[in-house]
Amino acid sequence: LLHILVARAQDEPAQESACPAIVKRAAWGAAKSKNVTYQLKPVANVIVHHTTGERCATVATCKEMVANIQTYHQTDNRWSDIGYNFLISGQNVYEGIGWHRMGAHLRGYNDKSIGVAFLGNFDQERPTPRSLNLLARLLQCGVELGELADDYRLYGARQLQSTNSPGRYLYAKLQELDHWQAQ
Protein backbone atom coordinates (compact mmCIF):
# COMPACT_ATOMS: atom_id res chain seq x y z
CA LEU A 1 0.00 0.00 0.00
CA LEU A 2 2.84 2.41 0.84
CA HIS A 3 4.47 1.68 -2.52
CA ILE A 4 1.21 2.53 -4.33
CA LEU A 5 0.85 5.84 -2.44
CA VAL A 6 4.45 6.84 -3.17
CA ALA A 7 4.12 5.91 -6.85
CA ARG A 8 0.85 7.81 -7.12
CA ALA A 9 2.34 10.92 -5.45
CA GLN A 10 5.26 10.85 -7.88
CA ASP A 11 2.88 10.77 -10.86
CA GLU A 12 0.90 13.82 -9.74
CA PRO A 13 2.26 17.18 -10.91
CA ALA A 14 3.69 19.35 -8.18
CA GLN A 15 1.77 22.53 -7.46
CA GLU A 16 3.92 25.50 -8.39
CA SER A 17 3.91 28.37 -5.98
CA ALA A 18 3.42 31.90 -7.24
CA CYS A 19 6.06 33.04 -4.78
CA PRO A 20 9.03 34.67 -6.45
CA ALA A 21 12.50 34.26 -4.98
CA ILE A 22 12.90 36.90 -2.29
CA VAL A 23 16.26 38.36 -1.28
CA LYS A 24 16.13 37.98 2.49
CA ARG A 25 17.16 40.64 5.01
CA ALA A 26 20.38 38.86 5.94
CA ALA A 27 21.43 38.79 2.27
CA TRP A 28 21.21 42.58 1.92
CA GLY A 29 22.80 43.25 5.31
CA ALA A 30 19.79 44.47 7.26
CA ALA A 31 20.38 46.05 10.64
CA LYS A 32 18.37 44.64 13.50
CA SER A 33 14.85 45.98 13.88
CA LYS A 34 14.46 48.21 16.92
CA ASN A 35 10.86 47.08 17.43
CA VAL A 36 8.40 44.76 15.69
CA THR A 37 4.66 45.34 15.54
CA TYR A 38 2.69 42.45 14.11
CA GLN A 39 -0.36 42.84 11.90
CA LEU A 40 -3.53 40.83 11.90
CA LYS A 41 -3.76 38.79 8.76
CA PRO A 42 -4.96 38.57 6.13
CA VAL A 43 -4.22 42.18 5.20
CA ALA A 44 -6.81 43.87 2.98
CA ASN A 45 -4.74 46.58 1.24
CA VAL A 46 -1.53 46.84 -0.76
CA ILE A 47 -0.01 50.28 -1.33
CA VAL A 48 2.67 50.74 -3.98
CA HIS A 49 5.36 53.43 -3.75
CA HIS A 50 8.54 54.39 -5.57
CA THR A 51 11.76 55.39 -3.85
CA THR A 52 12.39 58.35 -6.25
CA GLY A 53 16.12 57.67 -6.38
CA GLU A 54 18.26 56.08 -9.04
CA ARG A 55 17.38 52.68 -10.38
CA CYS A 56 19.88 49.99 -9.35
CA ALA A 57 21.52 47.94 -12.09
CA THR A 58 23.14 45.03 -10.25
CA VAL A 59 22.21 42.83 -7.31
CA ALA A 60 25.11 44.35 -5.34
CA THR A 61 23.97 47.94 -5.94
CA CYS A 62 20.34 47.00 -5.19
CA LYS A 63 21.34 45.41 -1.88
CA GLU A 64 23.31 48.52 -1.00
CA MET A 65 20.37 50.74 -1.95
CA VAL A 66 17.95 48.76 0.24
CA ALA A 67 20.40 48.91 3.16
CA ASN A 68 20.75 52.68 2.67
CA ILE A 69 16.96 53.09 2.71
CA GLN A 70 16.82 51.17 5.99
CA THR A 71 19.57 53.35 7.48
CA TYR A 72 17.72 56.50 6.40
CA HIS A 73 14.43 55.26 7.85
CA GLN A 74 16.02 54.22 11.15
CA THR A 75 18.38 57.18 11.57
CA ASP A 76 16.75 60.21 9.95
CA ASN A 77 13.09 59.22 10.36
CA ARG A 78 13.72 57.45 13.69
CA TRP A 79 11.60 54.49 12.65
CA SER A 80 12.18 51.04 14.10
CA ASP A 81 13.07 49.54 10.70
CA ILE A 82 12.76 50.02 6.97
CA GLY A 83 9.27 51.30 6.26
CA TYR A 84 8.35 48.94 3.40
CA ASN A 85 7.32 45.31 3.61
CA PHE A 86 8.99 44.56 0.26
CA LEU A 87 11.03 46.39 -2.37
CA ILE A 88 11.23 45.53 -6.06
CA SER A 89 14.05 46.23 -8.49
CA GLY A 90 14.08 45.40 -12.17
CA GLN A 91 15.21 41.86 -11.37
CA ASN A 92 14.40 40.93 -7.75
CA VAL A 93 12.12 41.23 -4.75
CA TYR A 94 13.83 42.31 -1.52
CA GLU A 95 12.39 41.57 1.90
CA GLY A 96 11.87 44.79 3.83
CA ILE A 97 10.08 43.99 7.07
CA GLY A 98 8.31 41.11 5.35
CA TRP A 99 4.87 39.61 5.82
CA HIS A 100 2.61 40.19 8.86
CA ARG A 101 4.65 43.07 10.23
CA MET A 102 3.41 46.63 10.29
CA GLY A 103 5.41 49.00 8.13
CA ALA A 104 5.85 52.75 8.18
CA HIS A 105 5.09 53.62 4.58
CA LEU A 106 1.84 55.64 4.67
CA ARG A 107 0.47 57.35 7.77
CA GLY A 108 -3.04 56.23 8.59
CA TYR A 109 -2.74 53.01 6.56
CA ASN A 110 0.23 51.20 8.10
CA ASP A 111 -1.89 48.97 10.33
CA LYS A 112 -4.14 47.81 7.49
CA SER A 113 -1.82 47.48 4.51
CA ILE A 114 1.49 46.25 3.23
CA GLY A 115 3.78 48.66 1.44
CA VAL A 116 5.72 47.66 -1.66
CA ALA A 117 8.31 50.11 -3.00
CA PHE A 118 9.78 50.01 -6.49
CA LEU A 119 13.43 51.10 -6.53
CA GLY A 120 13.75 54.07 -8.85
CA ASN A 121 11.92 57.17 -10.02
CA PHE A 122 8.87 56.25 -12.07
CA ASP A 123 8.02 59.81 -12.97
CA GLN A 124 11.13 59.58 -15.19
CA GLU A 125 11.41 55.88 -16.04
CA ARG A 126 8.97 53.16 -16.98
CA PRO A 127 8.72 50.00 -14.88
CA THR A 128 9.99 46.87 -16.60
CA PRO A 129 7.58 44.06 -17.48
CA ARG A 130 9.68 41.80 -15.25
CA SER A 131 9.29 44.09 -12.22
CA LEU A 132 5.51 44.24 -12.75
CA ASN A 133 5.43 40.45 -13.03
CA LEU A 134 7.39 40.19 -9.77
CA LEU A 135 4.80 42.40 -8.07
CA ALA A 136 1.91 40.29 -9.39
CA ARG A 137 3.63 37.07 -8.27
CA LEU A 138 4.48 38.51 -4.84
CA LEU A 139 0.87 39.52 -4.26
CA GLN A 140 -0.47 36.15 -5.45
CA CYS A 141 2.05 34.54 -3.10
CA GLY A 142 0.67 36.64 -0.25
CA VAL A 143 -2.83 35.34 -1.00
CA GLU A 144 -1.57 31.74 -1.13
CA LEU A 145 0.22 32.16 2.21
CA GLY A 146 -2.86 33.72 3.83
CA GLU A 147 -1.00 37.01 4.35
CA LEU A 148 -3.26 38.95 1.94
CA ALA A 149 -7.03 38.71 1.69
CA ASP A 150 -8.35 37.01 -1.45
CA ASP A 151 -10.10 40.28 -2.29
CA TYR A 152 -7.25 42.63 -1.30
CA ARG A 153 -7.29 46.14 -2.79
CA LEU A 154 -4.32 47.57 -4.71
CA TYR A 155 -3.54 51.29 -4.56
CA GLY A 156 -0.85 53.71 -5.62
CA ALA A 157 0.24 55.87 -2.66
CA ARG A 158 -0.95 59.01 -4.49
CA GLN A 159 -4.55 57.87 -4.14
CA LEU A 160 -4.36 57.98 -0.36
CA GLN A 161 -1.93 60.83 0.36
CA SER A 162 -0.72 64.00 -1.33
CA THR A 163 2.33 62.60 -3.14
CA ASN A 164 3.50 61.77 -6.66
CA SER A 165 4.39 58.24 -5.56
CA PRO A 166 4.52 55.75 -7.21
CA GLY A 167 5.31 57.98 -10.19
CA ARG A 168 3.14 58.49 -13.26
CA TYR A 169 4.48 55.59 -15.32
CA LEU A 170 4.20 53.01 -12.54
CA TYR A 171 0.81 54.38 -11.49
CA ALA A 172 -0.51 53.91 -15.04
CA LYS A 173 0.70 50.29 -15.12
CA LEU A 174 -0.78 49.48 -11.70
CA GLN A 175 -4.20 50.29 -13.10
CA GLU A 176 -3.88 47.29 -15.43
CA LEU A 177 -3.38 44.81 -12.57
CA ASP A 178 -5.94 42.66 -10.80
CA HIS A 179 -7.32 44.11 -7.56
CA TRP A 180 -6.71 47.71 -8.70
CA GLN A 181 -8.97 50.17 -6.88
CA ALA A 182 -9.97 53.30 -8.75
CA GLN A 183 -10.65 55.87 -6.08
Tell what function each PLM region has.
Residues 40-76:
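Active-site acidic/histidine clusters and adjacent loop/turn architecture
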Residues 1-51, 90-183:
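Basic/polar, cationic surfaces and motifs that engage anionic cell-wall
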Residues 76-77, 146:
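Alpha-helix termini
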